[in-house]
C-alpha cells in the first residue's frame, strides 16, 4: 500500500475497543437486534461490535480506510496514464475482465465499457468505490446502516450518476 501513497489503510478488527486510531464509530439502526458474538462466547452483541467477524472477511474486505486512501489505491490500478500503475496492464485486464455469471477479481462488477464497481455493506457501514467509463472515479462511505442493506450502494450510485449528469 505504501507505493500507492496509502499510509492509513488497515485491516479492521471485530470489536470497538480494538478500533484503529482514525477509525470511526459505527452506528446501526435504532431497533437492530443483537446477535451472538462471533467469538463463540454466546454473548449478545451488536453486529458492528463483535457480531460480524470482520477479521474473517479480509479476503473480501474488512478494510478500514478513508475515501482519499481508497482513491489513491484505485489510482494506481486504473490504467489512467496520469499516475503510474503498480500492476501490469495484463494483470489489470485479468482482474477487470467481464465474465458472464461470475464476479471479476476484487470487484462486484466490471463492464466492457470500462466501469468498475465495488461495494460492501455490513451493520454500521456501507461502502462504494466506482471507476466510471468517463474517467471519473469516486468513493462513498458511511458509518451508519440502512435497512436497504446490500442495495444501498446502488441507490447511492444512481444518486451520484444523476448529480454528475446535471453538471456535465
Predicted segments with their positions:
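A broadly conserved detector of short glycine/acidic/proline-rich loop/turn motifs that flank catalytic sites
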Residues: 111, 122, 143-144
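Extracellular/periplasmic catalytic domains that process cell-envelope and extracellular macromolecules
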Residues: 99-101, 121-123, 130-134
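Zn-dependent metallopeptidase/amidohydrolase metal-coordination segment
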Residues: 118
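Short, surface-exposed loop or secondary-structure junction motifs
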Residues: 1-115
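Short, well-ordered beta-strand elements
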Residues: 126-131, 136-148
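Short, gly/Ser/Thr-rich active-site loops of penicillin-recognizing serine hydrolases
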Residues: 112, 147-168
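Short, flexible micro-motifs
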Residues: 64-65, 123, 127
Amino acid at each position: 500500500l505504501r507505493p500507492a501513497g496509502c499510509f492509513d489503510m488497515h485491516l479492521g478488527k471485530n470489536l470497538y475497543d480494538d478500533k484503529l486510531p482514525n477509525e470511526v464509530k459505527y452506528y446501526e439502526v435504532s431497533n437492530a437486534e443483537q446477535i451472538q458474538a462471533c467469538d463463540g462466547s454466546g454473548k449478545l452483541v451488536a453486529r458492528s461490535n463483535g457480531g460480524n467477524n470482520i477479521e474473517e472477511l479480509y479476503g473480501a474486505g474488512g478494510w478500514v480506510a478513508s475515501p482519499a486512501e481508497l482513491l489513491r489505491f484505485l489510482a494506481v490500478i486504473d490504467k489512467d496514464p496520469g499516475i503510474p500503475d503498480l500492476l501490469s496492464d495484463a494483470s489489470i485486464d485479468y482482474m477487470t475482465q467481464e465474465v458472464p455469471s461470475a464476479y471479476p477479481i476484487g470487484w462486484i462488477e466490471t463492464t466492457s465499457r470500462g466501469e468498475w464497481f465495488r461495494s460492501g455493506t455490513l451493520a454500521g457501514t456501507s461502502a462504494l468505490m466506482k471507476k466510471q467509463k468517463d474517467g471519473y472515479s469516486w468513493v462513498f462511505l458511511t458509518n451508519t446502516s440502512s435497512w436497504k442493506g446490500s442495495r444501498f450502494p446502488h441507490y447511492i450510485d444512481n444518486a451520484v450518476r444523476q448529480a454528475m449528469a446535471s453538471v456535465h
